C-alpha cells in the first residue's frame, strides 16, 4: 500500500524533485542539486548569498538540516549534516537552498489515483516547530486567504497530475512575507498530521490510501471538498522515560486522541518520543482554540513526563490566537 516504488525513489531525492516540480509549473526555492563536497557547497553558498539552508537530499523529520550564516560555519556544518543524514537515511548527500525569512510552513494534502484524478484536501499550517520538528498543526491556515488558497490548490493539483503520481502525498511550501509560495519537498506517504485534515474534511485518508492501492478510482472531485471550520492538532511527546500509570483521554464531540498508550506502557529513550496526537474541530477557529485548550487541560498521562504544559502555553500565546506566528515562534519564547 502506497505509491509505486519508482515514484518513491524519484520523489525521495529532494534536490532532483525540485527540478521536476519546477518543470511542472511550481515556484521552487532557489538552490542546488546534490553537492559533492564542502568546497562545492561553499561556492554555491557564495553564489546564493548568505544565509543559506544546508539540507539532506533524502532527509525528513528535521534531520540533516543546518542554517548557515557565514562561510566560516559551513565546513563544520557540512560534515555534521552529512554524518547525520548518512546515519538517519543511509544517504549523506546534501544540497543548498536560499534561506527564506520570515516564513510559514504550509503544506497541501493530496490524493491521486492511477486514473489521473488528483484532489487537494486543503492546506495545513505547520509553522510551530522546534529544531525543524513539528509541534502543532492547524487547518486551514489563518495566514492563507481564500484567493491564495484557490490559486495554490489549482497550481499544485495541476503539477502533481503532470508527474503521474498515485497515492496519498503532501506538497510542502514556504510562504514568504509577500505571500509567495515556494515549493520545498514532497512526502510520499500519509504523514503524522493527516488526522487534522481528516477532522476538517471528514475524509478517511487511510481508507482512501488502501482503495487507491487496490485500483479504486476517487469517487469525489475538488468541487466536493468543503474546507469549513477549523481543526487543530497538538503532538503529545514524551520528555523522558517512564511507565504509564494512568491515562485519561478528553471526550466530547469532535475531539480525537490517536495513541497506542495503555496502562503499563513503558517509554524508553530508543524510539520516537511521539505518544499521541490530540485533535479537535469546531466551526470557527476561536472555538477550536478554546476546545484544544480545554482538551489539553483534561488530558492526563501519569508516569511519563510530557510536553502537555508546553502545548497549553503555545495555544494560549497571543501570537497563536491572532494567527500571526511563523517559523520563528519557538525561537522567540
Show the residue positions of the predicted features.
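Conserved beta-strand edge residues that scaffold enzyme active sites
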Residues: 7, 34-35, 59, 174
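A short, GP-enriched loop/loop-strand-helix hinge that lies immediately N-terminal to
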Residues: 1-12, 27-33
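Conserved thiamine diphosphate
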Residues: 16-33, 142-143
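Acidic/histidine-enriched active-site and ligand-binding environments that engage anionic O-linkages
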Residues: 43-53
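Short acidic loop-to-helix transition motifs that present clustered carboxylates
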Residues: 34-40, 101-103
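Residues within well-ordered alpha-helices
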Residues: 16-17, 41, 295, 310
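Short acidic active-site motifs
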Residues: 40-41, 73
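ATP-dependent carboxylate activation and anion-phosphoryl transfer catalytic cores
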Residues: 24-25, 48, 56, 61, ...
Amino acid at each position: 500500500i502506497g505509491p509505486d516504488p519508482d515514484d518513491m525513489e524519484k520523489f525521495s531525492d529532494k534536490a532532483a524533485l525540485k527540478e521536476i516540480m519546477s518543470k511542472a509549473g511550481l515556484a521552487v526555492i532557489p538552490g542546488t542539486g546534490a553537492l559533492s563536497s564542502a568546497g562545492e557547497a561553499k561556492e554555491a553558498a557564495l553564489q546564493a548569498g548568505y544565509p543559506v539552508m544546508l539540507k539532506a537530499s533524502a532527509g525528513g523529520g528535521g534531520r540533516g538540516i543546518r542554517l548557515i550564516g557565514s562561510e566560516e560555519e559551513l565546513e563544520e556544518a557540512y560534515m555534521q549534516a552529512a554524518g547525520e543524514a548518512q546515519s538517519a537515511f543511509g544517504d549523506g548527500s546534501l544540497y543548498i537552498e536560499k534561506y527564506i525569512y520570515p516564513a510559514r510552513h504550509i503544506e497541501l494534502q493530496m490524493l491521486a489515483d492511477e486514473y489521473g484524478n488528483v484532489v487537494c484536501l486543503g492546506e495545513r499550517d505547520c509553522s510551530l516547530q522546534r529544531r525543524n520538528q513539528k509541534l502543532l498543526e492547524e487547518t486551514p491556515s489563518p495566514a492563507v486567504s481564500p484567493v491564495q488558497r484557490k490559486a495554490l490548490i489549482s497550481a499544485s493539483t495541476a503539477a502533481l497530475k503532470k508527474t503521474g503520481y498515485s497515492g496519498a502525498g503532501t506538497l510542502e511550501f514556504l510562504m514568504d512575507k509577500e505571500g509567495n509560495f515556494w515549493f520545498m519537498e514532497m512526502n510520499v506517504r500519509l504523514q503524522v498530521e493527516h488526522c487534522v485534515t481528516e477532522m476538517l474534511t471528514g475524509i478517511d485518508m487511510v481508507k482512501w490510501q488502501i482503495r487507491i492501492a487496490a485500483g479504486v478510482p476517487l469517487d469525489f472531485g475538488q468541487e466536493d471538498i468543503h474546507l469549513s471550520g477549523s481543526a487543530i492538532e497538538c503532538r503529545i511527546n514524551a520528555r523522558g522515560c517512564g511507565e504509564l500509570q494512568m491515562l485519561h483521554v478528553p471526550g466530547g464531540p469532535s475531539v480525537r486522541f490517536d495513541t497506542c498508550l495503555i496502562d503499563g506502557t513503558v517509554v524508553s529513550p530508543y524510539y520516537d518520543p511521539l505518544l499521541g496526537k490530540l485533535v479537535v474541530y469546531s466551526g470557527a477557529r476561536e472555538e477550536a482554540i478554546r476546545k484544544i485548550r480545554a482538551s489539553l487541560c483534561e488530558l492526563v498521562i501519569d508516569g511519563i513526563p510530557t510536553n502537555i504544559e508546553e502545548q497549553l502555553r503555545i495555544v494560549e500565546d497571543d501570537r497563536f490566537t491572532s494567527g500571526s506566528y511563523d517559523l520563528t515562534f519557538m525561537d522567540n519564547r
